UniProtKB/Swiss-Prot annotation:
Location(s), subcellular: Golgi apparatus membrane; Endoplasmic reticulum
Name of the protein described by the UniProt record: Trafficking protein particle complex subunit 4
Oligomeric and partner information: Part of the multisubunit TRAPP (transport protein particle) complex.
InterPro entries the record matches: Longin-like_dom_sf (IPR011012), TRAPPC (IPR007233)
Record's function text: May play a role in vesicular transport from endoplasmic reticulum to Golgi.
Keywords on record: Endoplasmic reticulum, ER-Golgi transport, Golgi apparatus, Membrane, Transport
Principal location class: Golgi
A single Gene Ontology CC term: endoplasmic reticulum
Name of the gene: trappc4
Membership in a protein family: Belongs to the TRAPP small subunits family. TRAPPC4 subfamily.
Native organism taxonomy: Eukaryota, Amoebozoa, Evosea, Eumycetozoa, Dictyostelia
Length: 135
């Protein structure tokens, strides 16, 4: 079962991290930004569509025949989402693992500025290990 991409958006909807895995076709930088802002907008709209006030947290899963998208949003508004093979079953656990790596290797990095692009080699390395990607 294949993980295609992982995206991290800050609370304003700005793409702060993106990584493709396997044979995923690479897009232009602007296309990645467009995908991130589109998902952020859809997530915000979905969270406001609930007939019961305050009961919706937005989009959590989108499933198609071609892919499965799973989202995890933190209490601070950071969104982690993964695009994977439609048969992949443990994406929620994977996203929690990515969140743990984010807190351990990005937020604790003294050179990282909150809400800015993530450029941390140790985070990339640990993420690749989590996903079983060979260097």
């Amino acid at each position: 079962m294949t993980i295609n991409s992982i995206y991290i958006l800050n609370k304003a909807g700005t793409l702060i991290y993106q990584n493709d895995f396997g044979n995923t076709e690479k897009l232009s930088h602007n296309s990645y930004i467009r995908l991130g802002s589109t998902f952020h907008s859809l997530h915000a709209i979905a969270s406001n569509l609930s007939p019961v006030s305050g009961s919706s947290s937005g989009i959590e899963v989108i499933e198609t025949e071609a892919f499965k998208l799973q989202c995890f949003q933190t209490h601070t508004g950071i969104k982690f989402y993964v695009i994977a093979d439609p048969n992949h079953q443990q994406l929620e656990e994977l996203l929690h693992g990515v969140y743990e790596l984010y807190t351990d290797y990005v937020l604790k990095n003294p050179f990282y500025e909150i809400e800015m692009q993530i450029r941390c080699d140790l985070f990339d390395y640990k993420l690749n290990r989590l996903l079983g990607v060979r260097e």
